From Swiss-Prot:
The gene is FGD2. Zn(2+) 1 binds at residues 464, 467, 489, 492. It is found in: Cytoplasm, Cytoskeleton; Cytoplasm; Nucleus; Early endosome. This is FYVE, RhoGEF and PH domain-containing protein 2. The lineage of its organism: Eukaryota, Metazoa, Chordata, Craniata, Vertebrata. Pfam families: FYVE (PF01363), PH (PF00169), RhoGEF (PF00621), SOS1_NGEF_PH (PF22697). It comes from Homo sapiens.
């Protein structure tokens, strides 16, 4: 069960090939099909009670049976697929008169393969099953229940085929001259084939138990070896014989389709045969559905065990959509942290890998409902392939290992969101017209306190995002408003308000959110504070600025340390350069009116350096790349000449 995730094959054909290849060269020549050995006339069951005829397998007698590897037995995830069987199975070439009707040849093949199949069912039920059951009762070396689980409902399948299906086929073929049809017989008995779904659903579990108890119990292995070495078993293992019921329904579908193709256009059996084919197909689909449901619940149970039985996820309504590792972008730490996600159709489990993996591999940190969830890509140069998952309980900034993995995760999230919205009938028409942005902003205000916000990272600001006072480690520490996610100081966040997404518990909020959530008027001291010329919020995103990026600030003008500043030419003030300490700061520490400045190349030796010069003023900058330096020089030359954009996207040079 891998993120993102391996696709499961649609047919058991590959497993049959494994079984074929595991046989000895003496047991079956290369290329010979498993059914060719089983479907010989001498393999037919007796018509009356008495000692069973032994199967003549030629040189296979006495050869040592080969077992199928446990890895293959424990990894069967294949579905029954008639299409795959049509490609892998070809009709048996029958000997007989060349003048025999082609449709009768198919019916003859159906009868012969059914006789061989009943012989194998007899071996499974009356020999393997009964011998193991008798040994379990007498020796107590292994539980009877284990034997019953391994063989599932094989007794019912054997009785149906030996007492009903095979005799009906035999009678109809004997009476073929007077009544040349087979569709009505299959049509009458096809509904009983749905009993195969229980056997197929149990097959993987049976294979696991068989492999386990073969290793665990010497007496269990002794009984198997004795029967497998007999002529009746044909030197084939129990695992090989157990696979035949899984194969049988696709074989019926293949033969019946060929029978319909051979029928004359106006044959009286045309309608009945077609209806019988539809019923056979329905039985195959019933088995497929049983396998799918079994695998889905098995996946849930495996996740349940990996979580240490901490979370109740084994629910018939839950479906695991995707799982895998991601990196969590922290709002305090610089290095992303390893996390693991389990995405279901109705919830996301955000987990932390356990250091000591005794029992459970992961600990559930947060459970987020898919209902009301939003997902979008984060355009973050520092953390590429990152995306935001915003839910009612929590908002996460996550980083994938590649662009393809990020897209795959976002598609999985969006598919789950779309599905649950459709089910809840909550689709609404998207906002149209120029009011779209205003409506979105109003929607965000209305959701304040209803869903967990996206927290601004600590390093993205150097001052309180409400009062613009600089932070320091002793007297003014950073706090996060639990309603809007802003980084604020203690004085601006000295308020408590009940937040619905946190079960109406009181949480620390900033003064603006406190006023919105409670309706209380802000203190006059806060309202009367005048806005300074530098108190212009940083245009951290490209759509808010003509140019923005980090630049190294060089020279005594900036101090000896030469700090790195977030430089912005805003769209709404295109002739001024603002320099911030961090991208999310609400106040710049320097602003430079660019009109009349001269942009020159910096000192020789570093092509990434450029300067702004006017009279006695000189500012020196260093870009991270030459390409970025070229864009900054072009943007500053435009501003210095008095140029300003005439429409919103004109002259956009930002990252």
């Amino acid at each position: 069960m891998k993120g993102a995730s391996e696709e499961k094959l649609a047919s058991v054909s590959n497993l049959v090939t494994v079984f074929e290849n595991s046989r000895t060269p003496e047991a079956a020549p290369r290329g010979q099909r498993l059914e060719d050995v089983h479907h010989r006339p001498e393999c037919r069951p007796p018509e009356s009670p008495g000692p069973r005829e032994k199967t003549n397998v030629g040189e296979a007698v006495g050869s040592e049976p080969r077992t199928v590897s446990r890895r293959y037995l424990n990894s069967l995830k294949n579905k029954l697929s008639s299409e795959a069987w049509r490609k892998s199975c070809q009709p048996v070439t029958l000997s007989g008169s060349g003048t025999q009707e082609p449709e009768k040849k198919i019916v003859q093949e159906l009868l012969e393969t059914e006789q061989a199949y009943v012989a194998r069912l007899h071996l499974l039920d009356q020999v393997f099953f009964q011998e193991l059951l008798k040994t379990a009762r007498s020796s107590k070396a292994f539980p009877e229940d284990v034997v019953r689980v391994i063989f599932s409902n094989i007794s019912s399948i054997y009785q149906f085929h030996s007492q009903f299906f095979l005799p009906e086929l035999q009678r109809r073929l004997d009476d073929w001259t007077a009544n040349p049809r087979i569709g009505d017989v299959i049509q009458k008995l096809a509904p009983f084939l749905k009993m195969y779904s229980e056997y197929v659903k149990n097959f993987e579990r049976a294979a696991e138990l068989l492999a386990t108890w073969t290793d665990k119990s010497p007496l269990f292995q002794e009984v198997l070896t004795r029967i497998q070495s007999s002529e009746a078993s044909g030197s084939l293992t129990l695992q090989h014989h157990m696979l035949e019921p899984v194969q049988r329904i696709p074989r019926y579908e293949l033969l019946l389709k060929e029978y319909i193709q051979k029928l004359p256009a106006q044959a009286p059996d045309q309608a009945d045969a077609q209806k019988a084919l539809d019923m056979i197909f329905s039985a195959a689909q019933h088995s497929n559905a049983a396998i799918t449901e079994m695998e889905r619940l098995q996946d849930l149970w495996e996740v349940y065990q990996r979580l240490g039985l901490e979370d109740d996820i084994v629910d018939p309504s839950n479906t695991l959509l995707r799982e895998g590792p991601v990196l969590k972008i922290s709002f305090r730490r610089n290095d992303p942290m390893e996390r693991y996600l389990f995405l279901f159709n109705n919830m996301l489990l955000y987990c932390v890998p356990r250091v000591i993996q005794v029992g459970a591999q992961f600990q559930v940190r947060t459970r987020i409902d898919v209902a009301g969830m939003k997902v979008r890509e984060l355009m973050d140069a520092e953390f590429p392939h990152s995306f935001l998952v915003s839910g009612k309980q929590r908002t996460l900034e996550l980083q994938a290992r590649s662009q393809e993995e990020m897209i795959s995760w976002m598609q999985a999230f969006q598919a789950a969101i779309d599905q649950i919205e459709k089910r809840n009938e909550t689709f609404k028409a998207a906002a149209q017209g120029p009011e779209g942005d205003i409506q979105e902003q109003e929607l965000q205000s209305e959701e304040l306190g209803l869903r967990a916000p996206q927290w601004v990272r600590d390093k993205m600001v150097t001052m309180c995002m409400r009062c613009q006072e600089p932070f320091n480690a002793l007297t003014r520490r950073r706090h996060h408003c639990r309603a809007c996610g802003y980084v604020v100081c203690a004085r601006c966040s000295d308020y408590r308000a009940e937040l619905k997404y946190d079960d109406n518990r009181p949480n620390r909020v900033c003064l603006h959110c406190y006023a919105f959530l409670t309706g209380n008027v802000l203190p006059e001291a806060k309202e009367d504070k005048r806005r300074g010329i530098l108190e212009k919020g940083s245009s951290a995103t490209p759509d808010q600025s003509l140019m923005c990026s980090f630049l190294q600030l060089i020279g005594d003008k900036w101090g000896k340390s030469g700090p790195r500043g977030w430089c912005v030419i805003p769209r709404d003030d295109p002739l001024v350069l603002y320099v911030y300490a961090a991208p999310q700061d609400m106040r710049a520490h320097t602003s430079i009116p660019l009109l009349g400045y001269q942009v020159t190349v910096g000192p020789q030796g570093d092509p990434r350096v450029f300067q702004l010069q006017q009279s006695g003023q000189l500012y020196t900058f260093k870009a991270e790349t030459e390409e970025l330096k070229g864009r900054w020089v072009k943007a500053m030359e435009r501003a210095a000449s008095g140029w300003s954009p005439s429409w919103p996207n004109d002259g956009d040079l930002s990252d």
